[in-house]
């Protein structure tokens, strides 16, 4: 889902954004 190399918190935030976008 999120790009590799991102911090855990940022990964969770990115996934949340994807859910909102969907």
Curated annotation (Swiss-Prot):
Keywords: Cytoplasm. GO terms for cellular component: cytoplasm. Residues 1-22 are annotated as: Disordered. Residues 8-22 have a biased composition (Basic and acidic residues). The keyword Hydrolase does not apply. It is found in: Cytoplasm. To human SET/PHAPII protein. Has a role in the physiological regulation of fucosylation processes. Oligomer. This is Fuctinin-1. It comes from Rattus norvegicus (Rat).
């Amino acid at each position: 889902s999120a790009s590799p190399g991102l911090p855990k918190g940022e990964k969770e935030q990115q996934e949340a954004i994807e859910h909102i976008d969907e």
